[in-house]
Amino acid sequence: MRAWTTVEAGERLLLLRSCCAADAEFASPQGVTRGLEAFSGSIGAFLRSFPRAEVVAGPPDAHNGYVRVRWHTRFNDGATNPIFGDDFIEFDGDMRIRRVVSFDGSAADA
């Protein structure tokens, strides 16, 4: 989750390389990316769109090589419309992230 709060692109890419397969896929309502540079770019786009947002993750729920993480944003400027979501994470045989499928919505959707 640290990658989701890391603004500097080079540092974020290093974080992703430490835990993800080189061909990791990230699928969200905004589209699908493949590869760590594209994954990092998607995170960077999120951080640029919501510069005062902190992503807060709940405890992971895991079974059979899959993990679900529920998360929400917290805005340090007092904004009252957080984003809520669920990420479903698949690991490869080396326990590196192979795929993240993200579902998100506003508090009004929850």
Residue ranges and their predicted role:
Residues 11-65:
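A solvent-exposed, acidic/Ser-Thr-rich amphipathic alpha-helical stretch
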Residues 41, 45-110:
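A beta-strand edge to alpha-helix "cap/lid" segment located at domain peripheries
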Residues 1-9:
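Short, aromatic-enriched amphipathic alpha-helices that serve as compact interaction elements
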Residues 4, 20, 33-34, 71-73, ...:
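Bulky hydrophobic/aromatic packing residues
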Residues 8, 38, 81:
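Soluble or luminal CAZymes and related metallo-dependent hydrolases
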Residues 8, 12, 105-107:
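Poly-acidic low-complexity segments
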